[in-house]
Amino acid sequence: MSSFRPVFRSRWLPYLLVAPQLVITVIFFIWPAGEALWYSLQSVDPFGFSSQFVGLENFVALFHDSYYLDAFWTTIKFSALVTFSGLLVSLFFAALVDYVVRGSRFYQTLMLLPYAVAPAVAAVLWIFLFNPGRGLITHFLGEFGYDWNHAQNSGQAMFLVVFASVWKQISYNFLFFFAALQSIPRSLVEAAAIDGAGPIRRFFRLSLPLIAPVSFFLLVVNLVYAFFDTFPVIDAATAGGPVQATTTLIYKIYREGFTGLDLSASAAQSVVLMFLVIILTVVQFRYVESKVRYQ
């Protein structure tokens, strides 16, 4: 089988086409990452006018800081909850809508609505519903004797930010899962049904293996979302409290750099977070993707 190779009239045209993306990558990714790495090795004054090379002292101080270690483990727990809860809930709804025959369009539209809501607005929405004094959900919980106050209870605060973050991401995951389920040939599903496989067995033995590549893609995307894009939710809902119970690494970087004006510590934390995400992504690509098999 012969391979097709595009031929350009000018040898500079391919480089010209790639140039805009390269410029964007350098300006918005490589340059900031390089500056963060440089500042992490410096002792910088609060206004950034003077600096002194200190080597790895910022990293040593970082891992001797109990508050940073708490934020590190909070990030791991928070990211795991957001990633796996979001994937499971989205897959469940996608499977239900795929199974529904009548009113499918209505449910699809309903599931996509949260994606149009900004993260900070989503957090404020759920704060109103979980307001300890006037919230509709807290009033309902109070009828069963459960007191809710996420401003004082660290477990409830964590639940609130996880819940709001998952709700915001459901639409994105649903869109990909539903499209993947719709792409499965109906003939395969009908053949499995004729062989006596029920809906649940068809899902686990047929549909789930066939959408494994999409599941892997969403696993990586949701992990990055939990690490970085949940900052507005945490800032609007709990501001990292109570007692730093919901302070993740990305929120601690913001607080150290923009509130505390400790640019060196903030840069060192950024570098650690960057390498952590890179390591997790590489592990997923090497070990999780290798498990993707069709049955």
Swiss-Prot record:
It is found in: Cell inner membrane. Keywords: Cell inner membrane, Cell membrane, Membrane, Transmembrane, Transmembrane helix, Transport. It is a multi-pass membrane protein. Its main location: membrane. GO terms for cellular component: plasma membrane. GO terms for biological process: transmembrane transport. Residues 76-284 form the ABC transmembrane type-1 domain. InterPro entries: MetI-like (IPR000515), MetI-like_sf (IPR035906), UgpAE/MalFG_permease (IPR050809). Residues 1-11, 102-109, 179-207, 284-295 are cytoplasmic. The chain crosses the membrane at residues 12-32, 81-101, 110-130, 158-178, 208-228, 263-283. Residues 33-80, 131-157, 229-262 are periplasmic. Belongs to the binding-protein-dependent transport system permease family. UgpAE subfamily. The complex is composed of two ATP-binding proteins (UgpC), two transmembrane proteins (UgpA and UgpE) and a solute-binding protein (UgpB). Part of the ABC transporter complex UgpBAEC involved in sn-glycerol-3-phosphate (G3P) import. Probably responsible for the translocation of the substrate across the membrane. This is sn-glycerol-3-phosphate transport system permease protein UgpA. It comes from Salmonella choleraesuis (strain SC-B67). The gene is ugpA.
